[in-house]
């Protein structure tokens, strides 16, 4: 606390409102500026007022009642001089807000500065503070109240002519720095102790003559020599009665005077040069310094810093510096609110990017639009009152900062939509294809792809539209949409290629199954070389010569059928002709590989030897009609054997090379496979085995490709077959020789002589004869039905079963009696003794064991 009670002096950092109840000290007597001025303005609700505030300063000699005048006009509580002591009361510059603000006739937010009086004995000859305070008041205030007594009008010191000359000089100093703008101020002369003997108009004329004389006496820069005081100042005058002698009139007149502190408009019909002055509102728009209330404290501090350091005061520069400071401050405040809304989305997006899991952020677009609009609106509301150039520059900076971050979020949202859309598209297409396959019904792959592409593009557009910020150039998503559609097309093509690969695989498996069955039948037919077997029913010549023709025809027909299947199915994929050509080309190559693998499987040495033996046995053991041969000694076994063996041996050179009987040349595999399509890629060829005669880089000819058995294999196979055939021949010879054993004829004569009596007895006895007849008929029927073998086997099985059952019943009988159990026990004990293990020893030639021989050597 200082001179004024309940005024916050410099150094009082209290935030208690009672400390600022009556006002605040702006500058103390030591020329120190109060940094808490902004706190006072905030407590008085002046800070949010923008330009809706007014600043008044009062000048006058010390102890002339300046503070008293302000207290009556504005209801303030500035300290006044004690009647008992004639000494300085106001030190420095003090400020208070109008306390009569409830009167609607007065302007809002009137700030009053009580300036230290001049010509005081405390400062004496030191006029430095007087000049600095005048310059400060002129740079900040709209209205300068000059408080003088009536009897001082016409005097130089008493009428504050020295102070007014200082005001004119500092105003010219300010004007020189900003010639583009004419800073006008109002000098309001309040004539105290006005008794009316001298008319107010005469006092006005005297004061104006003094003003003109003072203006003419100051030095002016080039070009302003003939300027007038009216070019920079307006004047108003008012007389007040004596406070002590006419207290009631004084209060009434101050009340009336206070009503003039309101907004007004300049009356163009009045001419101050003719002594015509306004008696309306004192706050004209041209008086306002256009400093927003929230920046006034910083502006005033900058002005005072320039003044107290004796630097040339440059108001435009100070306004720009203030604008720079306040715009930066407002920008930071706006960005804090912006961060609260946007940082959570940035964190989510960056975390999703780190995890590699793109996430579409819900509500991002609304948050971006709301935060951007709120930030710009808040900045515009608070900062647009400052220097236009600085405001526009800082607004562009704010827009750049906000849009840079929002653009990153927008791009991240589109990227997440892009990546997740591609993944979902692939999964949706694959799922639809699998569902169609499980149902077993046909599905249109092209229709599935087109439908999913439409869904994916629609979702991308919806997310882009929801996230877009109207008016922001960076929120145009057409380029990203084009890239998205391009990648969708690439993924569609890749999925189509994969589906065609799967289709080709299914067709290849079908070809493999069909060829495995058809070619297997042809090889199985090699086991029968007679007519009616593997050969046609007509003709006697074996069909082995056209074996490869039949294999090739089956192969070509199967592949043609597969190609039709492939082409029909590929048409539903919306595949291009080039893709279909590549698929058919791959199918033919893969099919040849399947055929060759099947041939190699059938031509394995063991399988082929078995086929040759079966072919030989079929020709050797069966006649041309297919009837099995019963070898007799009179048969030409050697001739049949030779013909069958030689016929079978002709198969080995036939099977060793894939040749067509019609052309005696390999099949046209190179023409059948065709040239590599121009649209085929390296990926299309990497899994294809090389084919001799088709792939030049393979280095194998078509003849080599068609070679099934090498020369060494043929010779080895021939030798092994001949050995097998020889075994069959030896077996046939043994069978023929074994059939030569017969019963001698004389044996039947002996049998007849010795058994004649029995024969006669049987023939004479009807019962025996009938029984013999029945037995002969039964034997004949059994023979004709070829049932002797089964009957013998059944008899043997029945006898064995009867033996087992008899043993079982005997054991049960023995176990049921004590004697039997003892016999079984003795048998078991004896068997156990006889079952004792004895180690066997190896004997040498002399009949001795090895151990005995070694003992003998020792």
UniProtKB/Swiss-Prot annotation:
Enzyme class: hydrolase
Residue ranges annotated as Lumenal topological domain: 764-766
Keyword terms: Coiled coil, Endoplasmic reticulum, GTP-binding, Hydrolase, Membrane, Nucleotide-binding, Transmembrane, Transmembrane helix
Domain of life: Eukaryota
Record field: transmembrane: 743-763, 767-787
Coiled coil stretches, renumbered: 475-504
Topology term for the membrane: Multi-pass membrane protein
InterPro entries: G_GB1_RHD3_dom (IPR030386), P-loop_NTPase (IPR027417), RHD3/Sey1 (IPR008803), Sey1/RHD3-like_3HB (IPR046758)
Start and end residues of each stretch annotated as Disordered: 669-696, 825-858
Residue stretches of biased makeup (Acidic residues): 683-696
Keyword Signal applies: no
Enzyme Commission no: 3.6.5.-
Ranges per topology, Cytoplasmic: 1-742, 788-858
Principal location: endoplasmic reticulum
GO biological process, one term: endoplasmic reticulum membrane fusion
Domain annotation GB1/RHD3-type G: ranges: 50-300
Record: residues binding GTP: 60-67
GO cellular component: endoplasmic reticulum membrane
Functional summary from the UniProt entry: Cooperates with the reticulon proteins and tubule-shaping DP1 family proteins to generate and maintain the structure of the tubular endoplasmic reticulum network. Has GTPase activity, which is required for its function in ER organization.
Family listed: Belongs to the TRAFAC class dynamin-like GTPase superfamily. GB1/RHD3 GTPase family. RHD3 subfamily.
HAMAP family hit by this protein: Sey1
PANTHER family reported for this sequence: PROTEIN SEY1
Protein name (record): Protein sey1
Organism: Aspergillus niger (strain ATCC MYA-4892 / CBS 513.88 / FGSC A1513)
């Amino acid at each position: 606390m200082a001179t004024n009670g309940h005024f916050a002096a410099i150094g009082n950092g209290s935030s208690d409102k009672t400390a600022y109840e009556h006002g605040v000290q702006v500058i103390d007597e030591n020329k120190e500026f109060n940094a808490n001025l902004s706190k006072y303005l905030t407590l008085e609700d002046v800070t949010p007022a923008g330009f809706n505030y007014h600043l008044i300063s009062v000048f006058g000699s010390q102890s002339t009642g300046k503070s008293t005048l302000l207290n009556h006009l504005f209801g303030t509580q500035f300290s006044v001089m004690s009647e008992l002591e004639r000494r300085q009361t106001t030190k420095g510059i003090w400020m208070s807000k109008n306390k009569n603000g409830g009167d609607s006739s007065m302007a809002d937010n009137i700030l009053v500065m009580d300036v230290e009086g001049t010509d005081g004995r405390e400062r004496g000859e030191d006029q430095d503070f007087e000049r600095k305070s005048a310059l400060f008041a002129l740079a900040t205030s709209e209205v300068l109240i000059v408080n003088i007594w009536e009897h001082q009008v016409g005097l130089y010191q008493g009428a504050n002519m020295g102070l007014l000359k200082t005001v004119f000089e500092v105003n010219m100093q300010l004007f020189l720095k900003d010639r583009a703008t004419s800073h006008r101020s109002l000098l309001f002369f309040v004539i105290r102790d006005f008794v009316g003997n001298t008319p107010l108009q005469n006092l006005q004329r005297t004061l104006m003559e003094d003003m003109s004389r003072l203006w003419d006496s100051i030095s002016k820069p080039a070009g302003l020599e003939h300027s007038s005081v009216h070019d920079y100042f307006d004047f108003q005058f008012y007389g007040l009665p004596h406070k002590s002698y006419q207290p009631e009139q004084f209060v009434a007149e101050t009340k009336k005077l206070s009503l003039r502190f309101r907004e007004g408009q300049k009356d163009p019909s009045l001419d101050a040069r003719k002594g015509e002055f306004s008696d309306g509102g004192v706050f004209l728009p041209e008086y306002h310094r256009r400093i927003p209330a929230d920046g006034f404290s910083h502006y005033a501090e900058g002005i005072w810093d320039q003044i107290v350091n004796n630097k040339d005061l440059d108001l435009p520069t100070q306004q720009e510096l203030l604008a720079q400071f306040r715009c930066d401050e407002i920008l930071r405040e706006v960005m804090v609110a912006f961060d609260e809304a946007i940082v959570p989305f940035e964190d989510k997006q960056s975390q999703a990017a780190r995890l590699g899991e793109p996430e579409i952020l819900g509500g991002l677009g609304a948050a971006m639009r709301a935060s951007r609009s709120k930030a710009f609106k808040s900045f515009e509301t608070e900062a647009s009152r400052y220097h236009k150039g600085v405001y526009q520059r800082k607004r562009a900076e704010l827009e750049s900062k906000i849009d840079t971050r929002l653009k990153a979020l927008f791009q991240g949202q589109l990227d997440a939509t892009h990546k997740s859309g591609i993944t979902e598209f692939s999964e949706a297409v694959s799922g639809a294809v699998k569902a169609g396959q499980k149902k077993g019904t046909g599905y249109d792959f092209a229709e599935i792809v087109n439908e999913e592409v439409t869904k994916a593009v629609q979702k991308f557009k919806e997310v882009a539209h929801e996230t877009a910020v109207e008016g922001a150039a960076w929120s145009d998503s057409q380029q990203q949409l084009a890239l998205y559609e391009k990648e969708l097309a690439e993924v569609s093509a890749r999925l189509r290629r994969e589906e065609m690969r799967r289709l080709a695989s299914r067709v290849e498996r079908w070809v493999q199954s069909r060829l495995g069955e058809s070619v297997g039948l042809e090889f199985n037919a090699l086991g029968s070389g007679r007519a009616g077997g593997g050969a046609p029913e007509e003709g006697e010549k074996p069909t082995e010569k056209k074996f490869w023709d039949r294999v090739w025809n089956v192969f070509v027909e199967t592949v043609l059928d597969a190609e039709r299947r492939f082409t029909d199915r590929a048409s539903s994929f919306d595949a291009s002709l080039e893709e279909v050509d590549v698929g058919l080309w791959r199918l033919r190559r893969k099919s040849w590989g399947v055929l060759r693998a099947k041939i190699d499987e059938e031509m394995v040495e063991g399988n082929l030897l078995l086929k040759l033996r079966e072919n030989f046995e079929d020709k050797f053991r069966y006649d041309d009609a297919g009837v099995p041969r019963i070898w007799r000694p009179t048969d030409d076994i050697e001739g049949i054997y030779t013909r069958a063996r030689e016929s079978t041996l002709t198969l080995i050179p036939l099977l060793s090379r894939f040749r067509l009987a019609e052309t005696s040349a390999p099949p046209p595999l190179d023409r059948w496979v065709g040239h590599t399509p121009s649209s085929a890629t390296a990926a299309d060829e990497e899994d294809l085995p090389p084919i001799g005669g088709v792939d030049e880089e393979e280095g194998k000819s078509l003849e080599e490709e068609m070679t099934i058995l090498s020369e060494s294999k043929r010779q080895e196979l021939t030798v092994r077959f001949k050995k097998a055939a020889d075994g069959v021949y030896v077996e046939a010879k043994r069978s023929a020789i074994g059939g030569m054993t017969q019963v001698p004829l004389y044996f039947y004569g002996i049998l007849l002589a010795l058994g004649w009596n029995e024969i006669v007895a049987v023939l004479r006895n009807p019962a025996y004869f009938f029984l013999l007849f029945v037995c002969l008929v039964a034997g004949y029927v059994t023979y004709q039905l070829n049932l002797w073998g089964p009957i013998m086997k059944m008899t043997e099985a029945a006898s064995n079963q009867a033996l087992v059952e008899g043993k079982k019943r005997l054991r049960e009988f023995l176990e049921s009696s004590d004697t039997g159990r003892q016999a079984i026990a003795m048998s078991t004990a004896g068997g156990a003794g006889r079952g004792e293990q004895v180690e066997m020893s190896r004997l040498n030639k002399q009949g001795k064991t090895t151990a005995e021989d070694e003992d003998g050597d020792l």
